[in-house]
Amino acid sequence: MEQGGGGGGNEVVEEASPISSRPPANNLEELMRFSAAADDGGLGGGGGGGGGGSASSSSGNRWPREETLALLRIRSDMDSTFRDATLKAPLWEHVSRKLLELGYKRSSKKCKEKFENVQKYYKRTKETRGGRHDGKAYKFFSQLEALNTTPPSSSLDVTPLSVANPILMPSSSSSPFPVFSQPQPQTQTQPPQTHNVSFTPTPPPLPLPSMGPIFTGVTFSSHSSSTASGMGSDDDDDDMDVDQANIAGSSSRKRKRGNRGGGGKMMELFEGLVRQVMQKQAAMQRSFLEALEKREQERLDREEAWKRQEMARLAREHEVMSQERAASASRDAAIISLIQKITGHTIQLPPSLSSQPPPPYQPPPAVTKRVAEPPLSTAQSQSQQPIMAIPQQQILPPPPPSHPHAHQPEQKQQQQPQQEMVMSSEQSSLPSSSRWPKAEILALINLRSGMEPRYQDNVPKGLLWEEISTSMKRMGYNRNAKRCKEKWENINKYYKKVKESNKKRPQDAKTCPYFHRLDLLYRNKVLGSGGGSSTSGLPQDQKQSPVTAMKPPQEGLVNVQQTHGSASTEEEEPIEESPQGTEKKTL
């Protein structure tokens, strides 16, 4: 018997001979179901008799037939309670405890799932039962049919009979298949006794006229088939075991698929929620960044507007300051011209007294202190020393007309502080521009004429022009030595062209405003040197025309005064050519 119980797999293989005696179509279907059940975990051995015992078989995933029948009996007994109760969980706990009393350890959840699977398979079998034989569609069909068709009051009395008959079937049909008949009564004798004992109080309501034919028809359908053929009942048991295995495998697979499907749905749900949260977070981040960019742009716009306002304000202030500076310069120039006109007609001092300024000349130094005192002190110390050398040279020749010309060095000394004051007050905001203002040209002429004796000596001319540039910077004019030299050459060339034209220049000529100044300087050099080596700086026409050279100096003085008195800011015409013959020796 132990060999039959333990080697259930070999005995199932030996069952091929009765199965092969069936019709080909049914044989093929049963073989396919049997192979599927065998692949799921050796279903034939478990369905043969449960040689491992009820306790060991109940702990696995498969439900043996006896355990399933016990579950159906307990569920049938409690059918009315299940129908009336709203909460089913405590009832399934009670079903689990009853199964534990019978020796089957199953949780309430497992019991509920098993019953639902059996009920589902019953409904499916009932729908497709028309094309099959009675009793071969599903081995628990009769029990479930009785459970679903009986009224609630008689369900507790009917189900024990419908369940008790299949339990005794292996003993009645033990002759054809010793594999199922011999191990079951001996190894599991106690559980069937408990079943019979548990259903001893139920026999009184057995004689039911309405349900009698139902039970006989349903319960003994397999017996009728077994009496028709000697091997029929055992084949039905085999088929039901295979069906149970198929149901168990399919239900487990469906359960797995259902669990997997439920998990997939939950995952999809969570993924959707996560996606929504991420999208909202991204949208919030984008809006936050847009707000930051907008605020930054607004701040930049405000800063740009403020900068534009500041630039406009500074431009207005600069314009006002330049206008005020121009007005003050013109006012100072008018005052100086008035003083020059006054002093030019009243001052007649000898050259020896030129170092001691008379009382009428005290106001101009006061004006220079008010306008710009530091550049005046430096310019006077540098300009008075070289200019004093001109009278010393003029004293040497004794010609008679030297007396009228003796006033010219004094007048130049008077004019130089005044010109320096004008230059210091008219310092332009762009001293390094390409155009030279009138005051700057006059300052260059004064500095260059003051260094004429040094230019006559054999000394490097570059150092002298550097000194002139330094003196110009002290006076407020930013000109380098090269620019000063080029400007000096240009004004001498322009003076030569104007002189060669032999046109009578008016006293208020706007072009070449420094003509009279240069003319006066050149005339003084002719008279002082006597036409010697210093005549190289004089133009050719001045050498050839003694009449013009002997022109009275008073006219030149008046021209100089009128030139300084005019407040016009007209500049000289630009000269592109370089001097070719003027002052070769001096430069």
Swiss-Prot record:
Pro residues biased stretches: 201-210, 356-366
Induction per the UniProt record: Down-regulated by water stress.
Listed Acidic residues bias regions: 233-242
Residues spanning the membrane: none
Coiled coil (residue ranges): 285-328
Biological process according to GO: cellular response to water deprivation; DNA-templated transcription; negative regulation of cell growth; negative regulation of DNA endoreduplication; negative regulation of DNA-templated transcription; regulation of cell size; regulation of stomatal complex development; regulation of stomatal complex patterning
Gly residues: compositionally biased ranges: 1-10, 41-54
GO terms for MF: DNA binding; DNA-binding transcription factor activity; sequence-specific DNA binding
Domain Myb-like: 55-119, 434-492
Annotated segments matching region Disordered: 1-63, 173-264, 348-435, 530-587
Motif range (Nuclear localization signal 2): 472-479
Keyword Transferase: no
Free-text disruption phenotype from the record: Increased water deficit tolerance and higher integrated water use efficiency (WUE) by reducing daytime transpiration associated with a higher expression of SDD1. Increased trichome cell size with normal patterning and branching accompanied with an increase in the nuclear DNA content only in trichomes that have completed branching. No visible phenotype under normal growth conditions, but the double mutant seedlings gtl1-1 and df1-1 exhibit increased root hair length.
Keywords for the protein's UniProt record, in alphabetical order: Coiled coil, DNA-binding, Nucleus, Phosphoprotein, Repeat, Repressor, Transcription, Transcription regulation
Statement: the UniProt record of this protein carries the keyword DNA repair: no
Residue span of motif Nuclear localization signal 1: 96-103
Biological role: Transcription repressor that binds specific DNA sequence such as GT3 box 5'-GGTAAA-3' in the SDD1 promoter. Negative regulator of water use efficiency (WUE) via the promotion of stomatal density and distribution by the transcription repression of SDD1. Regulates the expression of several cell cycle genes and endoreduplication, especially in trichomes where it prevents ploidy-dependent plant cell growth. Regulates negatively root hair growth by directly binding RSL4 promoter and repressing RSL4 expression.
Any further remark recorded for this protein: Plants overexpressing GTL1 fail to develop root hairs.
Record protein name field: Trihelix transcription factor GTL1
Organism encoding this protein: Arabidopsis thaliana (Mouse-ear cress)
Gene for this chain: GTL1
